[in-house]
Regions:
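Local cysteine-cluster metal-coordination motifs and their immediate loop/turn environment
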Residues: 9-19
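Single conserved hydrophobic/aromatic residue that forms the stacking wall/gate
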Residues: 1-8
Length: 199
């Protein structure tokens, strides 16, 4: 089962996914969003009756912007309507620029048992070049915290970044492995039509 939280802290210059920067005053209207997700899930149930769900992936945008209580509510909605296997993998995407130690622990308490961290690079220069909201120190701290809180986690890395050499990309891979990442997802920077990077 895949669900998306299309809210982001800032627009990402290379991203062409359906995502929206929250520009409203006050908090993100999480209850309204979850109500809409519930409606969507209930409309889709006839398509999946009788199937057993092995994994749940809460993608983005940046679902880690939502409160742990909202993630708990989302997982309760899913569990009460779909048949999940015992010990189902429940992954949530997180941005190193939006993490706090207690939030990670609260997401785990809500039932998230795997984090996918959008590190992209451990180089401040590369992160700045692609307009990320976090820096290298925040990326390292998020990976280290994920290693201590979650049973398993993923680190997203990008390569072919502006000004990035082969040695720079290899250094990112080495650092992710040294920090104990059990899973890596490596993506080539793609210039998608309609994004600032493509123009």
């Amino acid at each position: 089962a895949v669900t998306g939280v299309q809210t982001c802290a800032l627009p990402i210059s290379y991203c062409d996914f359906n995502s929206h920067v929250w520009r409203g005053s006050g908090e993100i209207p999480e209850d309204d969003y979850l109500n809409a997700l519930q409606t969507d899930l209930e409309r889709s149930l006839p398509l999946v009756w009788g199937r057993t769900v092995q994994t749940v992936f809460i993608g983005g945008g940046t679902p880690s912007l939502f409160s742990p209580a909202s993630i708990d509510r989302l997982l309760t909605l899913i569990r009460s309507r779909l048949r999940l296997v015992a010990g189902a993998e429940i992954t949530m995407e997180a941005n190193p620029g939006t993490f706090e130690a207690q939030r990670f622990r609260d997401f785990a308490a809500a039932g998230v048992n795997r984090l996918s961290i959008g590190v992209q690079s451990f180089s401040d220069r590369a992160l700045e070049a692609i307009g990320r909201v976090h820096d290298a120190a925040q990326a390292r701290a998020a990976v280290d915290l994920a290693a201590s809180v979650f049973g398993t986690f993923n680190v997203d890395l990008m390569y072919a970044l502006p000004g990035q050499s082969l040695a720079d990309a290899q250094a990112d891979l080495s650092e992710a492995l040294q920090r104990g990442a059990p899973h890596l997802s490596c993506y080539h920077l793609t210039l998608e039509p309609g994004t600032p990077f493509a123009s």
